[in-house]
UniProtKB/Swiss-Prot annotation:
Residues forming the catalytic site: S93 (nucleophile), H118
The keyword Magnesium is annotated on this UniProt entry: no
GO cellular component, one term: endopeptidase Clp complex
Protein role: Cleaves peptides in various proteins in a process that requires ATP hydrolysis. Has a chymotrypsin-like activity. Plays a major role in the degradation of misfolded proteins.
Keyword list, A-Z: Cytoplasm, Hydrolase, Protease, Serine protease
Organism: Rhodococcus jostii (strain RHA1)
GO biological process: protein quality control for misfolded or incompletely synthesized proteins
Subcellular location, principal: cytoplasm
Pfam families: CLP_protease
Name of the protein this chain belongs to: ATP-dependent Clp protease proteolytic subunit 3
InterPro entries named in the record: ClpP, ClpP/crotonase-like_dom_sf, ClpP/TepA, ClpP_His_AS
């Protein structure tokens, strides 16, 4: 594909298109509805095109909407492909949840990435009844996030609840030791094989 073939696309769109063709999705910035729509659509399209080859998610995100993040999480689990997750720079809050929710054995951090885990938060206001309803919903989201992290890291829910009660920061090595990622890499060659089409024949 050439730039001339897509005159209405800007550089970022062209870059995203090239990455998509390499079965690579970038999750950068706040996790919101726009990110969820794009990521879920691309995951489904890539799975439909080839249900066996890996899909790679590079994550550089401070987190954001729990609902948007859970939409991406559910789609990652829905597709039959292995999903390689790569922490690139900063993966916090819902970004950290998505990072550790990749296919086990294929959750990766770059050497100087920072990862942060904490409990979900949200602004609460309105009448007393509204506040009670919102508080119940927030508590349910918190428990759901803790159960996901427990399943992905192998730690008991009670330990996840304790460890995420306040912001907890991890270096790449600490995240590996905790079970958030499986490997810390410093070479693209350690990630690139996941995006390479299988060879047929000799």
């Amino acid at each position: 594909m050439t730039t001339a073939a897509l005159p209405d696309l800007n550089y970022r769109d062209l870059l995203a298109d090239r990455l998509f063709r390499q079965r690579t999705i970038l999750l950068t910035g706040e996790v919101d509805d726009a990110m969820a729509e794009r990521a879920c659509s691309e995951l489904v399209l890539l799975a439909a095109a080839d249900p066996k080859r890996d899909i790679v998610l590079y994550i550089n995100s401070p987190g954001g909407s729990v609902f948007a993040g859970l939409a991406i999480y559910d789609t990652m689990k829905l597709v039959p492909n292995d999903v390689v997750t790569v922490a690139m720079g900063f993966a916090a809050s819902m970004g950290q949840v998505l990072l550790c929710s990749g296919t086990h054995g294929k959750r990766i951090s770059l050497a100087h990435s920072r990862i942060m885990m904490h409990q979900p938060s949200a602004g609460i206001g309105g009448t007393a009844v509204d506040i009670a309803i919102q508080a119940e919903s927030l508590e349910r989201m918190k428990r759901q996030s803790q159960e996901i992290l427990a399943a992905e890291t192998g730690h008991p829910v009670e330990q996840i609840a304790e460890d995420s009660d306040r912001d907890r920061w991890f270096t790449a090595d600490e995240a590996r030791d905790y079970g958030i990622v499986d490997r810390v890499v410093s070479s693209f060659a350690e990630i690139a094989p996941h995006t390479t089409a299988p060879r047929i024949g000799l």
